[in-house]
């Protein structure tokens, strides 16, 4: 086929069109606009000038200053408070405190840096999809050049096995079969002819053609997908929760600091009539204690460790977590957007029961279709037909001679065969209408074939016509082979399980609407499948979609004829309607939506770009692993929620007891070192909460901050009352000579130790209350890991207080009294927690109730009590 000649139509500015108009306008106009000559190509000088104008054919790298990136991790409410505490420690010379606080800050920064580095890998994976070398005509000769040196207007040759190096319009050649499944989601290679567009990053499976480059770098289909990935990304709900909690505690701490400073300055200037450097240092120390007490410094680490242990459990079930926050977000996912090809289906064509036209035996239709196929071609249709042959004797004894591969013009394949007796037979297979033309059947005689094809299309099947001839002239139409990409064996059950967990499943596919509807019917989805190009505005902005479009997205069971920008917009639309969205996929075309989704899931066999953009990567085929992931996520979420309630309540207790002791007794009830020890002892059991026995919610669960803060505040208030009463009792003992002597509480330093012991014992007993919404003495019981950690830390704190390690020693009697007092308050707080939950349940509709006990702990050898 000869090259296309140029015409004299108006030009289109290639720099302004970014390749999009050049994909649509007539081919002669493309050549004229790009000043491209298919017979000579560009000169070296022209290529160099265009390279300078349009840039390299590569995805640009965004360079980030490492120092600026690290400094970015040191911002935020919790980080600011940690830094403030460290600065105050340095000012007053408390270098031990400074070292401990700085070490915690460094740990959190390192963890953030590691997580952020993983986020940049999506673009790197997309770059790997680009071709490395290309055959280009320069100065009238075919030469090999690096793909990143290709420019718009270059004449490029593509052939079997090559990766298309740039978006190009094909200008000459017979045909090419191009696999663009990773880009568009189409399950079969697409036949290309002169004038068609070949996408950058797609793979040539058959044929050889020549094209003119119309888009490079970010101006290609692949490049625009990469740009979407770069701009995608949702803020972690765990981060939002930590910021909310941090802000709540910081505001409270600032108020308390102001109150304390005013009181202390008043006492020094008005009452004592003096305020020297020593007073200022003491005041700074007081501020330091309050700041350290107000900061949940271990909260980011505890969140990460809890989710990391959950990630280990998920990996054993065939799901690898690339972004830890996705675990808790999976717990709240209420909408699952699933790619069809290779995710809900096997991505393998399968032949259905043959439809007979003139043949009398269905096996004959399969037999002659197989004889018109080649196993070595790699063609998925040939593979499916050959796999449909269950009896090898059907095709034995035949020798394939001449073979004419698929021709996009005739739309069929022909083979000349010789049987064991030396007879020649011709076989053909192809589009049903093409086989009709080959057999010469027309008019009413062709109606049965047309009707069968229409019925198959309505059910989502592709149709393959089969014919034979003894002389190559007179052909007999044997029958039609229905072909489909069948659903995975577990797809229907997985979708049913997902619905039981409160998830709405939506199918998203690049295939035609009829195919999508049939697949939806087979796997138990609804059949409200909408064509994406009809649903979305032509020049849509995903951030400002019409309300009507959002309504459509919410109500639809799935979308057909979907392109990357549609998938991305579907996720955005659902998120704008307050849905937590999980998106599954396996191709480059899925990457933007995978990254934007609250929990992107790359299924088994996904390309690198999809795996890098996803938060969860499945190593086993199908979606069944997602059900296990959801259960695990909801367990972990329950544990994190329990920790959050505990941490806020205990922090309130510590902050207010410091203020109360200072205001009412003129005593700082805790030293900074004591607070650091409390923090360490409290977080040891928390690290084992990842192994705790909890319950699974049958519905999606989210961060309900008003409820969490309400429960935390109420428990915190009663914990403050508990601690304040014990401080009052201790103060009374201290000022009663007989009690003071008998119980060994002889000075304010011992009183500080008493408060320290009460907070550690009471705090750990409080953890047993916050770990469940039900009565703390009923199932599920604490795991042996959590219980062992609590017992171990209690032994440690008793030894610290009994032997006077780091603190003045307490008597055995005082330690025993402290334990008895806290056990009594544990019962009181347990009643308060249960009554609070019942009251909140009465006020809150649509609450996710925890009803199912977890029977499988994180590790196989661990068992619940």
Segments the model singles out, each with a brief description of its role:
Residues 329-477, 483, 496, 505-524, ...:
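Cytosolic catalytic regions of ATP/NTP-dependent phosphoryl-transfer enzymes
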Residues 107, 111, 141, 214-217, ...:
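Conserved beta-strand/loop elements of the cytosolic catalytic core of P-type E1-E2 ATPases, chiefly
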Residues 1-151, 156-164, 169-177, 181-247, ...:
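Non-lumenal N-terminal regulatory segments of integral membrane proteins
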Residues 177-179, 184, 346-366, 521-525, ...:
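Basic, amphipathic juxtamembrane/active-site segments
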């Amino acid at each position: 086929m000869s090259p296309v000649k140029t015409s004299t139509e108006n030009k289109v500015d290639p720099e302004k069109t970014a390749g999009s108009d050049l994909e649509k306008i007539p081919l002669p106009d493309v050549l004229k606009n790009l000043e491209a000559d298919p017979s000579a190509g560009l000169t070296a000088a022209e290529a160099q000038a265009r390279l300078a104008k349009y840039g390299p054919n590569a995805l640009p790298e965004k360079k980030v200053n490492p120092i600026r990136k690290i400094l970015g991790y040191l911002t935020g409410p919790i980080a600011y408070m940690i830094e403030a505490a460290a600065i105050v420690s340095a000012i007053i010379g408390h270098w031990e405190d400074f070292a401990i606080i700085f070490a915690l800050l460094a740990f959190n920064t390192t963890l953030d840096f590691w997580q952020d580095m993983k986020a940049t890998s999506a673009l790197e994976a997309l770059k790997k999809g680009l071709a490395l070398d290309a055959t280009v005509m320069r100065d009238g000769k075919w030469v090999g050049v690096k793909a990143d040196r290709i420019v718009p207007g270059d004449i490029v040759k593509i052939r079997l096995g090559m990766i298309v190096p740039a978006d190009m319009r094909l200008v000459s050649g017979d045909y090419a079969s191009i696999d663009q499944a990773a880009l568009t989601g189409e399950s079969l290679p697409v036949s290309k002819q002169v004038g068609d567009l070949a996408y950058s990053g797609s793979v040539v499976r058959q044929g050889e053609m020549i094209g003119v480059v119309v888009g490079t770098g970010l101006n290609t289909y692949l490049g625009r997908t990469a740009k979407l990935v770069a701009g995608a990304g949702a803020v972690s709900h765990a981060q939002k929760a930590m910021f909310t909690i941090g802000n709540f505690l910081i505001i409270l701490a600032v108020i308390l600091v102001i109150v304390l400073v005013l009181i202390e300055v008043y006492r020094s200037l008005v009452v004592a009539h003096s305020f020297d450097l020593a007073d200022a240092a003491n005041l700074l120390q007081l501020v330091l204690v309050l700041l350290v007490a107000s900061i949940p410094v271990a909260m980011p680490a505890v969140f990460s460790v809890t989710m990391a242990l959950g990630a280990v459990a998920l990996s054993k079930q065939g799901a690898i977590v690339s972004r830890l926050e996705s675990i808790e977000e999976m717990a709240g996912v209420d909408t699952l957007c699933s790619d069809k090809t290779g995710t809900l289906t096997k991505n393998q064509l399968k032949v259905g029961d043959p439809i007979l036209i003139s043949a009398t035996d269905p096996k004959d239709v399969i037999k002659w279709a197989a004889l018109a196929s080649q196993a070595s071609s790699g063609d998925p249709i040939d593979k499916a037909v050959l796999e449909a042959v269950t009896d090898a004797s059907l095709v034995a004894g035949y020798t394939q001679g001449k073979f004419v591969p698929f021709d996009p013009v005739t739309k069929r394949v022909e083979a000349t065969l010789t049987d064991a007796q030396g007879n020649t037979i011709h076989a053909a297979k192809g589009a049903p209408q093409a086989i009709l033309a080959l057999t010469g059947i027309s008019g009413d005689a062709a109606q049965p074939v047309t009707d069968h094809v229409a019925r198959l299309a309505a059910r989502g099947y592709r149709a393959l016509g089969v014919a034979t001839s003894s002389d190559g002239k007179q052909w007999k139409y044997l029958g039609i082979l229905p072909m489909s990409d069948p659903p995975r064996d577990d797809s229907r059950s997985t979708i049913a399980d997902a619905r039981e967990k409160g998830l709405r499943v939506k199918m998203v596919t690049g295939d035609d609407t009829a195919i999508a509807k049939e697949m939806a019917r087979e796997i138990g989805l609804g059949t409200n499948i909408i064509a994406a190009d009809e649903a979305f505005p032509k020049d849509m902005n995903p951030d400002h979609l019409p309300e009507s479009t959002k309504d459509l997205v919410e109500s639809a069971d799935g979308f057909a004829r979907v392109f990357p920008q549609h998938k991305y917009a579907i996720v955005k639309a659902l998120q704008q309607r307050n849905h937590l969205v999980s998106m599954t996929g396996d191709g480059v075309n899925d990457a933007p939506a995978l990254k934007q989704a609250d929990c992107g899931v790359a299924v088994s066999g996904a390309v690198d770009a999809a795996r890098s953009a996803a938060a969860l990567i499945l190593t086993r085929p199908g979606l069944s692993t997602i059900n296990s992931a959801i259960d695990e996520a909801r367990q972990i979420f329950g544990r994190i929620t329990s920790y959050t309630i505990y941490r806020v309540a205990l922090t309130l207790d510590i902050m207010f007891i410091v203020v109360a002791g200072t205001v009412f007794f003129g005593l700082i009830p805790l030293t900074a070192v004591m607070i650091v020890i409390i923090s360490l002892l409290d977080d040891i059991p928390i690290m084992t909460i990842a192994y705790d026995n909890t319950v699974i919610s049958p519905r999606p669960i989210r961060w309900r901050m008003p409820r969490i803060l309400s429960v935390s505040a109420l428990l915190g208030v009663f914990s403050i009352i508990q601690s304040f009463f014990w401080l009052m009792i201790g103060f009374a003992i201290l000022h009663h000579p007989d009690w003071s002597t008998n119980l060994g509480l002889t000075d304010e330093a011992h009183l500080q130790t008493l408060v320290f012991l009460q907070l550690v014992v009471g705090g750990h007993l409080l953890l047993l209350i916050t770990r469940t919404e039900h009565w703390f003495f009923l199932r599920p019981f604490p795991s042996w890991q959590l219980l062992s950690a609590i017992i171990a830390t209690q032994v440690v704190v008793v030894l610290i207080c009994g032997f006077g390690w780091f603190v003045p020693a307490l008597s055995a009697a005082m330690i025993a009294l402290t334990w008895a007092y806290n056990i009594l308050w544990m019962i009181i707080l347990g009643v308060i927690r249960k009554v609070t939950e019942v009251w909140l349940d009465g006020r809150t509709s649509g609450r996710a109730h925890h009803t199912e006990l977890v029977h499988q702990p994180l590790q196989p050898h661990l068992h619940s009590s």
